[in-house]
A protein has these predicted regions:
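Low-acidity, Ser/Thr- and Arg-rich intrinsically disordered low-complexity segments
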Residues: 2-10, 17-18, 24-29
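Alpha-helical, largely C-terminal catalytic domains
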Residues: 33, 103, 162, 166
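Auxiliary, metal-adjacent structural segments of Zn-dependent hydrolase domains
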Residues: 33-82, 89-93, 137, 141-142
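Secondary-structure capping and boundary motifs in well-ordered enzyme cores
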Residues: 91-96, 123, 127
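Active-site recognition of the HExxH zinc-binding catalytic motif
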Residues: 97-110
């Protein structure tokens, strides 16, 4: 079961009861301040073309938004990535983990569902959990990023997991998500590697 509440103008998701092995709270209620984002890896820290090429492998388009402009389709606002259809929107100050998380929401959807997406990709807990795993794998496919950095930035942003960190979740507590991703043709098991 999942409940939604408003806190400081943000949607904060909490799951009231979850099976063993799943994410306890997808995003924690924290006040995001500019200093927090400055410590995270952002799109301006890596090559835009590398990220665009990675997303294109999954039929997605990355659209650069000018600095200081609002990001279309951003669920969280500020510098967080946005989604409209098969396009991911990001600015130079968008955290890479945010861009990958939102892109993964589209990647796990079939094309007919992607076309309907605007801002909020899913209400599926299974998809949300799988996205947390997939974004770390995509991090390894981007020069200058890497899964370790993506997982650390997820923790800093405020994701909360039962085992205490995003890395512990992905490595020790996400078997159902790995199985879900494999069933949807996105990862190979037991290697735990990307198919594309």
């Amino acid at each position: 079961m999942r409940s939604t509440r408003r806190s400081s103008g943000r949607n904060v998701l909490f799951q009231a009861s979850r099976p063993v092995g799943a994410v306890r709270a997808i995003r924690a209620s924290i006040a995001l301040i500019p200093e927090t984002f400055r410590t995270m890896l952002t799109l301006s820290d890596i090559a835009f073309d590398d990220v665009a090429a990675l997303l294109a492998r999954y039929g997605l388009r990355l659209e650069r938004v000018a600095d200081g402009e609002p990001i279309p389709g951003s669920y969280w606002g500020e510098c967080e990535a946005g989604l409209i259809g098969s396009t991911v929107y990001a600015r130079g100050d968008t955290p890479v983990h945010s861009l990958l998380h939102e892109a993964c929401h589209l990647i796990v959807l079939p094309p007919e569902r992607r076309a309907q997406v605007h801002t909020d990709a899913t209400d599926s807990i299974e998809e949300e959990d799988a996205v947390c795993v997939l974004q770390s794998l995509l991090g390894d496919a981007i020069p200058g990023a890497g899964s370790e950095r993506i997982l650390a930035d997820m923790d800093e942003w405020g994701y909360t997991f039962r085992l205490g960190s995003a890395r512990a979740y992905v490595e020790q507590d996400a078997e159902s998500s790995w199985q879900w991703l494999a069933a949807h043709g996105l990862v190979k098991l037991p290697e735990r590697s990307l198919i594309r």
